[in-house]
Amino acid sequence: MPVLQPVSVDVVIVGGGLAGLAAARRVDRAGVNWLLVEAADRIGGRVATDMVDGWRLDRGFQVLNTAYPRVPALVDIAALDMRYFTPGVLVRRGPALHRLENPLRDPGSTPKTLTAGVGTLADRLKFAALATRYATLSPARLLDAPETTAQEALRRAGLSHRMIEEVLRPFLSGVFADRALDTSSHVLAMVLRSFARGRIGVPANGMAALPVAVAGPLPYPQLLVGARTVSVARGMVVTDGGEIRCRAVIVATDPATAATLLPSLPRPDMRGLTTYYFGADRAPIDEPTLLLDGDRREIVANTVVMSNAAPEYAPAGKSLIAASSVGVSAPSGASEAVIRVELSRMYGVPTDDWDLLTVVTLPQALPAANVPQGNLRKQVALGDGLFVAGDHRDSPSIQGALASGWRTAGEVLTSLGALAGPPAA
């Protein structure tokens, strides 16, 4: 626990996740005095990677989308040494694996996509049209559209029940941690827009490389880790190591902690995800492609051989398989056995000799984004010099966290009379 000498700064940022780091980048660029305090012994928040006996295990299955506008604005994507997944998915339905590719990312795949054994030809044409619309319309146009649930938006697009249930529900339930697809159609539009326009992958050194890259230009002494914030008030932040006087406070913690520090702030509903990591001597498939369960078992939402995309995630000669389930399952032998059976069915290979490396349970993986969400940008200025940032104030995504932190810092700088810089993307 760092012991603070009496200190006074312009801005205190509470929380060193992506939102807090993005806010720090903007206030630092404006030349105001600031300090970031983080309770954990590292930065990154929910974006973290553990090294275990040569395995690189992210804290839950996470990916980085290169089409998120705030990502290239804050980091050099090339320097992340990205490892990319295939622009499409595989779908297990009965004894066969079917492929559905993203023709916007891989134009040569269009004939294969139209003849794939996933949904009807009409379904595939309608989905291609929907993805093209999301990819080409501006975010403002998409967010001006009438709002409904993600499931209803897919139905209104003319997609069949089978296409929704066998492909889109398993895919999107893993993205939103929402099996019912009650998530706002505005969030759906922005997420599918990014998937259509960008590439999906992970940094070679794990997802933890992202917050490290965001923090890269910041002066290290102003990132105070291992300091738990006890309370915030007008002009004051109290940590377990002392008090910090300030002109403005940005609370950029997880939503539950933010609601504790700011009692007037509604506590959002959170959604959970569970990720099972297995090690194997051989990869069950040879490609870095997300595999979905089209048989509607609703046990494994998706699975992927991480080391097919990023060999750095596994020791030499080994393969790392990630499998994600919606909700929080206890890491018991019974649930492990069920997961093994499902993965054996989906990959079409025995899984008895796979080693269960760990089970990552995230009860608060993502804030729920049910209707209504409007333009996704919730109020961040709370009065009395108090501000709040995080993906719960924007879209539930890496983009949402970064954009919220950047936007909130802009409002803080405006309130202080400092140069706010360009608007958030």
How would you label these PLM feature ranges?
Residues 188-240, 244-247:
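Helical element adjacent to the flavin cofactor pocket in flavoenzyme catalytic cores
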Residues 71-72, 76, 81-181, 196-197:
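Mobile amphipathic helical/loop "lid" adjacent to a hydrophobic cofactor/ligand pocket
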